[in-house]
Structure formats: C-alpha cells, structure tokens
Amino acid sequence: MSIDRYGAPGCDDLAVCRLTADGMLDCVYELDGHMRVLNHDGCTVSTVQASTVPKPRSWPGGACATADGTLFVSNRGPNTISAWQRSGPTRHFLCEWPTGDWPRALCAVPGTLYLLAACQREGAVHCYYCSPLPRRAPTETASLALPGASCALVLD
C-alpha cells in the first residue's frame, strides 16, 4: 500500500493513528491542520479540521485512538484536545476542551478511560478522565511537572 503523504499542498503527515478493520487509515496533518481518512489505496476519502477553534490556527501535534474508535487530537496553537468518532469514511466531532501550552503528544491509557497529554511549552503532562463523551467534558485528574514534556507513553 502506498500512501500519498502530500494529500494537500503544504501539508505533512504527523500522526498515522490506526488502520481500521475496513481498511481505512486515520491520519493527522500538522501543517494544514486537518485530519484525513485514507482508503486502502492511500486516497483521501474525507477531510475535516482537527480543531473547531477558529483562531489561533491549529497545528495538530499528535493523536491517539481508543479501542472504541474515539480519536483524540492535540491542537497546538489553540491548546486544545479534540475528540472524534468515525462513522463510515467520515469523522464526527464529539467535544473539544482546553489543555496545557503546546500539547505535543497524547496517549490513551489501555483498558481505562484516561488520556495523557504532554504539553511541551508548559512543561507538564496532564491526565484526563474521558467519560462519558460527549455528554460530559473530560476532567483533569492529575498534572505532573515535566520540563520540555514532548511524549507520553504507558509502559508495562
């Protein structure tokens, strides 16, 4: 399978999230601020802005998907996290909430409803409880000071 990583002029793929059972691939593009769903041939089948906040401009920093198919995207610029659900080839908006300065990486904690966000310029990793989306906004449950935080991983 070849993927056209230059789906739009001036864009670059930053995060390839998951290949779904139907052969679709979720991609987040940093430079043009969009999310795309690609088919098995690498062709774009849908495109949506990664953040619903119009200004400042969004540069998605990272993304992760949960077992139920929820896609979380960190939006640098507006400093938010957006949550999306896919139905067929398109993504549908669930919610968006503020987070720390310059969210660079996200990690869904397997087997839980927790999400970690590494916020680089703030120098912190934030932990959010994400249930039930979209009826209730996620709540921050912890924050860890970590200068230059740029990655969040769960290690066994």
Label every model-predicted segment.
Residues 1-6, 45-50, 92-98, 136-146:
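Beta-propeller fold detector
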Residues 5-25, 52-68, 97-114, 144-156:
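Beta-rich, blade/repeat-based domains predominating
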Residues 21-22, 27-31, 71-77, 117-120:
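Conserved beta-strand positions in repeat-built beta-propeller and related beta-rich domains
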Residues 30-72:
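Long, well-ordered mid-to-C-terminal structural blocks that present hydrophobic/aromatic surfaces
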Residues 33-36, 79-81, 123-125:
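Structural signal for beta-propeller blades
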Residues 38-45, 84-90, 128-135:
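Short loop/turn segments immediately following beta-strands, especially the blade-tip
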Residues 76-111:
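Intrinsically disordered, low-complexity segments enriched in Gly and acidic/Ser/Thr residues
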Residues 120-132, 137-156:
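Blade-level signature of beta-propeller repeat domains, shared across WD40, Kelch, NHL, RCC1
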